[in-house]
Amino acid sequence: MGSPNKQGSHDCHGAPLGKDEIAATRECIGWPHAPFEIPAEVYSAWDGKARGATFEENWNARFAAYRAAFPAEAAEFERRVMKRELPANWAATKAAYIASCREKSENIATRKASQNALAALVPAVPEIFGGSADLAGSNLTFVKGSKGVTRSEGGNYCYYGVREFGMTAIANGIALHGGLLPYTATFLVFSDYARNGIRMAALMKQRQIMVYTHDSIGLGEDGPTHQPIEHIPSLRIIPNLDVWRPADATETAIAWTCAIERADGPSMLALSRQNLPTVTAKASDADIAKGGYVLADCDGAAKVTFIATGSEIKLALDAQAALAGEGIAARVVSMPCTNVFDRQDAAYRKSVIGQAPCVAIEATHPDFWHKYVGTNGAVVGINRFGESGKGPAVMAHLGITPEHVAKTALASTGCMRETPRMAAMPSRRRRAMRLAWRALRSQKRGADART
């Protein structure tokens, strides 16, 4: 509007008007002032300092009266909105809940572990405000203590309907308003629909927790339309987004507490549909909270280091045991949040990864992990879409097995040369084994070149 020759056309969108059209526009709207000259009457109309000071003075007076009439509510408002602090009993609540997870040592899906965490933490942190995109029963995000928002009544849980982007954008608005800590939920594969809202939460440094369940091909018969492949790697590279993929109930509890405590950005929890065993009995809370740590070390120097997350941690432990039977020492690193791990100091990161060749294991696209394993390591992942079938069968079909992990470690790192069993073999058999090892190395290089 106002550009006599370009208004109503695409020429006004994304391109300068040009000297002649600017002059014509000035004449059209009656603007005689020089460029960057702001008339005094316009400046005074837009200068909000004096008016703002009056508004602030009036608000402070109203809040003082409110505090006198409702001291408890005013203190809660100050804590949540003005100080942005968690409740005074938060540290004790957190420690007690994590300890209870360790005592139970349950084999449960991490989505169920997340539900248990919410049930314990929502009453302790009343500003938590949940919701799901029509999948509350599958995401397990509606817990005892949740109350759905209706047209006539308030609550702490919103049924957003099948609109992942709308849900995420609304939660961003709730976070920007202050006083509430929103979490949202859907299947991980549907994060594609929420992508811009996720990115904006990270860009604006807003506290939102995204609960994304059914995190891999392990979900089973829903098939490739519902089985995420590229999603976790692509979400990890969004700046300022912490992506957690916990391996058991304890890692899930710590992921939740870290997400609640984070003040400068959003967090995402990728959670399993299938049950997972307890694997962190000996891991410390502090190490897990660092995003990556040595879960199971070996005696002496490791010949290979396995790095895994979530449901693949058990595979790494089984592969470690298989290699130990061959006399090959392996270390297992659990890395539930690469983003948090990368923020640790260099000395800590080096102490966890170690000097041995690395094999990363995750039922996602493999490309992300090459920055950790380098050119001398390998990645056991999936660079194709999934299949419909029972979760374990699909995992086996796509090579996400302890046997394939151990085989990859042998083929990729040269560990086979070190095997004591080989040293005891007749020379002809040793030569045959070395030829097989070289063939595996060649096959691995060819696969790397193709991906």
Regions found by a protein language model. Name each.
Residues 448-450:
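Short, intrinsically disordered C-terminal tails of secreted or membrane-associated proteins
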Residues 445:
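Cationic, low-complexity basic patches in intrinsically disordered or flexible, solvent-exposed regions
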